Curated annotation (Swiss-Prot):
InterPro entries: ATP_synth_F1_dsu/esu, ATP_synth_F1_dsu/esu_N, ATPsynth_dsu/esu_N. Residues 97-124 are annotated as: Disordered. It is a peripheral membrane protein. One of its GO terms (molecular function) is ATP binding. Belongs to the ATPase epsilon chain family. This is ATP synthase epsilon chain. The keyword Transport applies. The gene is atpC.
Length: 124
C-alpha cells in the first residue's frame, strides 16, 4: 500500500509524526481525504473539527482539532492545528457535561468536537 510522511502538530506541541496511508480532515471547504500522490494543496481547518490519520501500521488515530491548516505536498501531509487532543484522551462524561454546562458557544463547540472525535475513533 502507498504511504506518505505525515504529521499532526499543535501550536503547543507535536502530537504525531510518521508514515500514513491516508489523512482525513474537516476543512472550511468540507471533509477531505488525502492519499499518497494527492495534488498539493493548502486547506483551512474548521474551528472545531476532527482529523483522522491511518498509519502504515494499520492504526487509526483520531484527534479533535481547533482551527489551523492542512498542507499537502508531494512528499508530506502536515496538519498544523491551533490546538488538538487525541480522541482516546477525551473523558467522554466530562465532555458531555461541558456541552450541557458551557458558558459560551466556543466552549460548547470544543466539547462537541471532542465527542465527535471519540465517536469517529470507534467507527471502523
Amino acid at each position: 500500500m502507498a504511504e506518505i510522511a505525515a504529521e499532526l502538530v499543535a501550536v503547543e506541541k507535536a502530537l504525531w509524526s510518521g508514515t500514513a496511508t491516508a489523512v482525513i480532515a474537516e476543512t472550511t471547504e468540507g471533509e477531505i481525504g488525502v492519499l499518497p500522490g494527492h495534488e498539493p494543496l493548502l486547506g483551512q481547518l474548521v474551528e472545531n473539527g476532527v482529523v483522522i490519520i491511518r498509519t502504515t501500521e494499520g492504526e487509526k488515530l483520531v484527534a479533535a482539532v481547533q482551527g489551523g491548516f492542512l498542507s499537502v505536498s508531494s512528499k508530506k501531509i502536515t496538519v498544523l492545528a491551533d490546538s488538538a487532543v487525541w480522541a482516546d484522551e477525551v473523558d467522554q462524561a466530562d465532555a458531555e457535561a461541558r456541552v450541557r454546562e458551557a458558558s459560551s458557544e466556543e466552549e460548547k463547540s470544543r466539547a462537541e468536537s471532542e465527542l465527535r472525535a471519540v465517536k469517529r475513533s470507534k467507527e471502523k
